[in-house]
């Protein structure tokens, strides 16, 4: 049976973004160890958000692109986030 997880290599801003979200009362489920999946599932104010965290000019891997396409074909937004203000804006905090 194939493993559905891999050695976690998180972007440098991953932990800080998760901490920021939790400080604003969001529930964050960290999925970074899953293959071909988004980094975090965020639940905030009655909404669910799928987010892929990238630092700098980081690009989506082939597996992440596959996940993004799968999520979006069901009409769900797949957010690629890099900065604190961007994350807070998506949640409507700023």
Feature roles, as predicted:
Residues 1-94:
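Catalytic phosphate/metal-binding cores of nucleic-acid and nucleotide-processing enzymes, i.e., regions
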